[in-house]
Curated annotation (Swiss-Prot):
This is ATP synthase subunit b 2. Pfam families: ATP-synt_B. F(1)F(0) ATP synthase produces ATP from ADP in the presence of a proton or sodium gradient. F-type ATPases consist of two structural domains, F(1) containing the extramembraneous catalytic core and F(0) containing the membrane proton channel, linked together by a central stalk and a peripheral stalk. During catalysis, ATP synthesis in the catalytic domain of F(1) is coupled via a rotary mechanism of the central stalk subunits to proton translocation. Keywords: ATP synthesis, Cell inner membrane, Cell membrane, CF(0), Hydrogen ion transport, Ion transport, Membrane, Transmembrane, Transmembrane helix, Transport. The keyword Transmembrane helix applies. Its main location: membrane. The chain crosses the membrane at residues 39-59. GO terms for molecular function: proton-transporting ATP synthase activity, rotational mechanism. The keyword Zinc does not apply. One of its GO terms (cellular component) is plasma membrane.
């Protein structure tokens, strides 16, 4: 089939295929005669790519990774420092709290002991006052009883003497009336 430049004479018109297109052979990368030059070009390309990546890109990425690692380590160190500080502050707080509780307990015990001692002193003083008043009251009661009994004896002797006089018409002897009253009071 000859190539024509005039019009289209079918679906393959104007298409270059095979030797008709002016090229000889197949697809150039697959031709075995060009393998050596392709491998050299590929090796040069990878060496250039390796140099570019290792000299330009990797240091930047490595620097970023190292900076990030340093930042992480710094943050962890700072976090540990802050944690240590907070632990120390917590221990100090707990120590102060325990100390305050201990002081409050001691103050409470001391106040209770003082109040108990003061109450005991006041109780003893009050007991002594009450004992003195009771002794005085007992003396007063005893003297009043003695006085009342002596008055009762006198009243009883007078009454007995008058009763005997009324019944017998004779005035009894005062000594015999007193002896009879004393005998009756004793028993």
């Amino acid at each position: 089939m000859a190539e024509s430049h005039g019009g289209a004479k079918g679906p393959a018109a104007g298409a270059h295929t095979g030797a008709e297109g002016g090229h000889g052979g197949g697809f150039p990368p697959f031709e075995s005669s060009t393998y050596a030059s392709q491998l050299v070009s590929l090796a040069i390309f990878f060496v250039v790519l390796y140099v570019i990546v290792s000299k330009l890109a990797l240091p930047k990425v490595g620097g970023a990774i190292e900076a990030r690692q340093n930042k992480i380590e710094g943050d962890l160190a700072e976090a540990q420092t802050l944690r240590d500080q907070s632990d120390a502050a917590l221990k100090a707080y707990e120590s102060e709290l325990a100390s305050a509780r201990s002081r409050a307990q001691a103050i409470g015990n001391e106040s209770r002991d003082k109040a108990n001692a003061q109450a005991e002193t006041e109780r003893k003083a009050l007991e002594e006052q009450l004992a003195a008043k009771l002794a005085g009251a007992e003396k007063t009661i005893a003297s009043t009883r003695t006085a009342a009994m002596s008055n009762v004896r006198g009243i009883a002797a007078d009454a007995a003497g008058q009763i005997v006089q009324q019944l017998t018409g004779v005035v009894p002897d005062a000594a015999s009336v007193n002896a009879a009253v004393d005998a009756s009071l004793k028993g």
